[in-house]
Amino acid sequence: MAASMARRLWPLLTRRGFRPRGGCISNDSPRRSFTTEKRNRNLLYEYAREGYSALPQLDIERFCACPEEAAHALELRKGELRSADLPAIISTWQELRQLQEQIRSLEEEKAAVTEAVRALLANQDSGEVQQDPKYQGLRARGREIRKELVHLYPREAQLEEQFYLQALKLPNQTHPDVPVGDESQARVLHMVGDKPVFSFQPRGHLEIGEKLDIIRQKRLSHVSGHRSYYLRGAGALLQHGLVNFTFNKLLRRGFTPMTVPDLLRGAVFEGCGMTPNANPSQIYNIDPARFKDLNLAGTAEVGLAGYFMDHTVAFRDLPVRMVCSSTCYRAETNTGQEPRGLYRVHHFTKVEMFGVTGPGLEQSSQLLEEFLSLQMEILTELGLHFRVLDMPTQELGLPAYRKFDIEAWMPGRGRFGEVTSASNCTDFQSRRLHIMFQTEAGELQFAHTVNATACAVPRLLIALLESNQQKDGSVLVPPALQSYLGTDRITAPTHVPLQYIGPNQPRKPGLPGQPAVS
């Protein structure tokens, strides 16, 4: 127990700048800013070292078995690591394994020495045992072992941290059929429906929504910042209708409904293959001066994965299918892309599918195909024209083994736009978050995880408004959503839209007690 505690404390102390000095611990840590510390940290590793979870069980053996093949696969993925980084990671891991075996052997010997000393003390009186050469030899050997371990524990902590800080950046394996390259190399698997034909120049969703007074995005910088929006009336009903339509369909298919926290620890994000400490990051971080390590989730996938973290699922309950509607928060740091409209916004509602399967690619691949089929069914019932893409290597991120995107036609934008994504993450997330299943024999094994968008509201609003617009400015409601809106057509408002009276207006009515401004 003492040895285990010592090994647990070493990385915590050294990471905070503490060093042994004359039998005591002193702090030599220089002052560092939060942003400086973030760059060299891995929250998942720290989370484990502080005892909240076990260390990630990364599958390094597969890299060691075929290092050339692994290096080639790494080069094809987009990420921080390149093939030249792999040998150092493998070397560090091998050295760490050898050192841990040496420590284990010494700790076993130390335990045996302790037992032998206790046996001598039990059978002889104190005076006699002190003179016993065997006792003296055991005590001397015990001191030697402790000295060796005192030097080995810090080295183990150093190697362990060095290994995990790099190895946790390694991506998942890649399906052999995945196209190689960037998004331009995506393979079209299916083309469903036809492009809508108009006798007029189709308008964009924002113009349509503003004229119908169902979307507001103007003059919000002083209210909620850029890339925010309001949905009003039929716009809000469309959102609720899409969520309820999707939810009801999935509940009928046996999905378990869930709600999840919006605020989560960084370790859960990193366990899912996301990087809250990246610069820039798409993840909103709560001020660490007030709330340590809390982040706003950009997808319910993170919360659902966190639900299973450090837990086992009974084998007979597999595969698990879950559905969750949540508000998603994304920084959208590339402000040059689509600055107006609903395509890239800081917050939106999304319905997410999440699955946990047993071992082997067959089960998780089947669930991925099932999720994709449901996505296609939903979009078909909404009457949209769309295409299914097999995404290439550089679009898989860290966790995906294979990923399918669906892009819907958006006439106002004049191009396809991504509306759903589905990924098979195999055991990438479960090895980091310890998502396990228990066999009927009681054995624990790593599960596979699969996630997929069921309904991303803003992007579906774009496709629906632009595809169903009419010459008179109204919008037809798809039959699948008519019961939720109570109408088959969204028409011009009968109310008077709000009038802006804030600063920088050429004409505005006077405020109480003030003349009108011209």
Swiss-Prot record:
Pfam family, one: tRNA-synt_2b
Any one GO BP annotation for this protein: mitochondrial seryl-tRNA aminoacylation
The keyword Acetylation is assigned to this record: yes
Positions bearing N6-succinyllysine: K195
Keywords tagged on the record: Acetylation, Aminoacyl-tRNA synthetase, ATP-binding, Ligase, Mitochondrion, Nucleotide-binding, Protein biosynthesis, Transit peptide
Region of interest: Disordered: 498-518
Reaction catalysed by this enzyme: tRNA(Ser) + L-serine + ATP = L-seryl-tRNA(Ser) + AMP + diphosphate + H(+); tRNA(Sec) + L-serine + ATP = L-seryl-tRNA(Sec) + AMP + diphosphate + H(+)
Binding positions for ATP per the UniProt entry: R330, A331, E332, V345, E418, V419, T420, S421
PANTHER family: SERYL-TRNA SYNTHETASE
Protein name (Swiss-Prot/TrEMBL): Serine--tRNA ligase, mitochondrial
Gene of this entry: SARS2
